[in-house]
Design a protein with these regions (language model features):
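Conserved P-loop NTPase motor module
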Residues: 1, 6-7, 11-16, 28, ...
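Accessory regions of macromolecular translocation/handling assemblies
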Residues: 1-103, 133, 144, 271-276, ...
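Conserved ATP-driven motor cores of ASCE-family P-loop NTPases powering translocation/secretion/packaging/pilus
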Residues: 2-3, 66-68, 91-110, 308-394
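Generic beta-strand/beta-sheet core signal
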Residues: 44, 53-55, 81, 121-123, ...
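Flexible loop/turn segments at secondary-structure boundaries
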Residues: 48, 59, 86-88, 127-129, ...
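Hydrophobic alpha-helical scaffolding
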Residues: 57, 147-150, 196, 296-299, ...
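P-loop NTPase motor domains
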Residues: 68-78, 85-308, 334, 378-379, ...
């Protein structure tokens, strides 16, 4: 049984063949595959962001890999946040097997093995180039959102940054910020008279929030040399975009660190990149796997900042794709900014799952060819319901799609393969060694050390003056008391005498038959 020709005609109209696009796959309708790789995302619309969602094991990571490698092939640099370590294989060519051959045949795709230029990055420096950023580059507003500070605490942090700017104190890492806070809440408090001052309670909150961030590994992230975001925009000698892979297996239980880096990176790109508006191809595309780690437990201020950056960075030619199990993992404000949807199968085992399924189905455009809710539960592995923004900015009707196989390896590099690539990477060597140049912490320590000798000299001078001073003279006309008189006048002598007297009087009164009255109880 052949696929309904009306479905194919509608797909050809939605995805015209003359458009430069990222090929996704062939249309599927009532279990029949169209045999033509028609469905794709226009390259000029990749900066309109997207969502890749679906239950575990439905093929989300392979879809991510498929889109990323085609972007690289078109000269577009790519950034991948790899939580599970599944996509490092993009750096080497895939191997054909029966499943690959069958999928290529079903979709009418001419599959060829290929690897792509890749660089590996790390927030801990263990499996890639060490990523770092300075506290100064964050600035007080962004850092306040990361630390989840209230308005008063945020204003104090801004005050501290202003003070450091005025005094030439560099804030490179968290130890610099801690040193300044401790100084200004102690011996340097007088320096703040022109800035408004700050309470020790507020300083305590800031220090505690910093400790919490450090416990997630931020002490490794803040510092120098700072990662140059231009390294994410590299194109290889043969014109292919570089795929930068951030290995996150060792920090997947530290979402605050991941969120901190992501927000800094997007905000810095937005600040540094020029406005380009609508372009033929994006300047850079991000893929954030396991996106719920970014949004889980994030503060309202941080979510607002992420939503704002995602909304605005489109005009810089940068696209952002989130990969997660369910659309409900992404806040509605962010979800509304995602123009492309590649929705793999959803499972409805519980009432909550059923509710999420209905909500996901309602977000798709209307279509006369599919029952969207039923289709979402019947998709096979490597199939997805796809709707994208056309070059005119209008969402296409959703089409069930059988995805083509990636041309790179569908699996991670071995440890030996990864180490070989790291050892030959100039980028890894560039960021391998931390730089600890003079900054606020060292400058304040030097200032305290310079003040210490002055204090010692002052103390020595006081001692010398006391030694030179003449001894006090005895009062005229009266000889000094003898040693015996001094002993009798001492407090101890008076105490001993009183004890002896009370003992003698007690014995005398007892012999006369007189009882001593009990002492009165003190009333309070």
């Amino acid at each position: 049984m052949a696929i309904d020709p009306a479905v194919l005609d509608a797909a050809r109209a939605a995805f015209p063949s003359g458009t430069r696009a990222i090929t996704l796959g062939a249309v599927v309708h009532e279990t029949q595959c169209g045999g033509e790789p028609l469905v794709g995302i226009p390259l000029s619309m990749m900066n309109r962001h997207g969502l890749i969602a679906g239950a575990t094991g439905t093929g989300k990571t392979k879809t991510l890999q498929l889109i990323a490698e085609q972007l690289a092939a078109n000269g577009v640099p790519v950034f991948l946040a790899d939580i599970k370590g599944d996509v490092s294989g993009i750096a080497t060519a895939g191997v054909s097997n029966d499943r690959v051959a069958s999928r290529a045949r079903d979709t009418g795709y001419q599959w060829q093995p290929n690897g792509y230029p890749a660089e590996f990055l790390s927030l801990t420096g263990t499996k890639g180039a060490q990523l770092r950023a300075t506290v100064s580059s964050f600035g007080p507003l962004l850092l306040a959102k990361v630390l989840d500070l209230n308005e008063t605490q945020s204003s104090v942090l801004s005050l501290v940054f202003k003070y450091c700017d005025d005094k030439g104190l560099l804030l490179l890492d968290l130890s610099d910020l801690r040193s300044v806070l401790q100084y200004l809440s102690g011996e340097g408090a007088a320096d703040l008279k022109d800035y408004g001052g700050m309470s020790k309670q507020t300083v305590g909150v800031l220090l505690r929030e910093m400790v919490e961030l450090e416990q997630q590994g931020a002490d490794r992230f803040f510092g120098e040399p700072e990662f140059e975001l231009a390294d994410l925009l590299k194109v290889s000698a043969d014109g292919r975009g570089t795929v930068s892979i951030l290995e996150l297996q060792d920090v997947q239980n530290k979402p605050a660190l991941f969120s901190t880096f992501m927000l800094w990176m997007l905000a810095t790109l937005y600040h540094d990149l020029p406005e380009v508006g609508d372009v033929d191809e994006p300047k850079l595309v991000f893929f954030f796997d396991e996106a719920h780690l970014i949004f889980d437990d994030a503060s309202k201020a941080l979510l607002d900042q992420i939503e704002q950056v995602v909304r605005l960075i489109r005009s810089k030619g940068v696209g952002v794709f989130f990969i997660t199990q369910s659309p409900k993992d992404v806040p509605a404000e962010v979800l509304g900014q995602l123009g492309h949807r590649v929705q793999h199968a959803l499972r409805a085992f519980t009432p909550d799952d059923e509710k999420a399924l209905k909500a996901a189905a309602r977000t798709f455009p209307k279509t006369k060819f599919y029952d969207v809710q039923e289709t979402l539960t019947s998709l096979g592995i490597g199939e997805a319901l796809v709707t994208v923004l056309s070059p005119s900015g209008v969402p296409t009707s959703p089409f069930a799609t059988r995805l083509i196989p990636p041309s790179s390896r569908m699996g991670p590099l071995t440890d030996d393969e990864l180490q070989q690539r790291l050892s030959s990477s100039t980028q890894v060597r560039k960021y391998a060694t931390a730089v600890d140049r003079e900054s606020a912490r060292e400058m304040l320590s030097a200032r305290a050390a310079a003040a210490a000798p002055d204090q010692d000299e002052s103390d020595d001078e006081t001692v010398k003056r006391n030694e030179r001073a003449p001894a006090p003279r005895a009062r005229a006309g009266k000889e000094p008391p003898s040693t015996f008189e001094q002993v009798l006048k001492s407090p101890m002598a008076r105490t001993v005498a009183g004890t002896i007297t009370r003992g003698l009087m007690g014995a005398l009164m007892g012999s006369l038959g007189i009882r001593r009255s009990a002492p009165r109880r003190r009333r309070y």
